[in-house]
Amino acid sequence: MKYELTATEARVIGCLLEKQVTTPEQYPLSVNGVVTACNQKTNREPVMNLTEQEVQEQLDNLVKRHFLRTVSGFGNRVTKYEQRFCNSEFGDLKLSAAEVALVTTLLLRGAQTPGELRSRASRMHEFSDMAEVESTLERLASREDGPYVVRLAREPGKRESRYMHLFCGDVDELSLQTSAPESASGDLQSRVEALESEVAELKQRLDSLLAHLGE
């Protein structure tokens, strides 16, 4: 597979994929928009505190690698960025809406169970049931041009196995296990996090609207 992203590159691409679906009126994103999305405290694991300079360096690298492209339309003085990571006109990686939702959530939060993914990806795609989540994960894991995700060994005491994306290379399961947050009520936590993300995005939309009205 030709994808070998750093953790920060994965965060940038994940943010652009997410905002393309959840806040299309604000997409493509400016550098400031990408910084805000990367450092968002909801629906991010781990939470990052990237500077504008750090994000700009990642954007420049990803443009050179043809994973992003710059957009500067007529009358638009601010350079904006859109993803060419998947489903672009000349790109090779074609994903369904369900696959985009799962890949994005894995890029933004790392290894997760199917139950967590269903809840956290719901703003991008409404999965009808757990079977749809699991079948989508299996397709991503068995694609001829992939695999793009891998099923991890089930941890002791856990009911579900977690899945991880492979866009940053092979997975070190030991480090993932030691860094995995402990939660006795993971499904409830996932639903709360999804609601927090919706509130954060509504606030972001309101701030953007107020700023636009004040111009």
Swiss-Prot record:
Q: Which SUPFAM superfamilies match?
A: Winged helix' DNA-binding domain (SSF46785)
InterPro entries named among the record's database cross-references: DUF480, WH-like_DNA-bd_sf, WH_DNA-bd_sf
Q: Output the Pfam families linked to this UniProt entry.
A: DUF480
- Tell me the protein family, please: Belongs to the UPF0502 family.
Supply the name of the protein.
UPF0502 protein YceH
* Native source organism of the sequence: Salmonella typhimurium (strain LT2 / SGSC1412 / ATCC 700720)
Q: What is the lineage of its organism?
A: Bacteria, Pseudomonadati, Pseudomonadota, Gammaproteobacteria, Enterobacterales
Gene this chain is encoded by: yceH
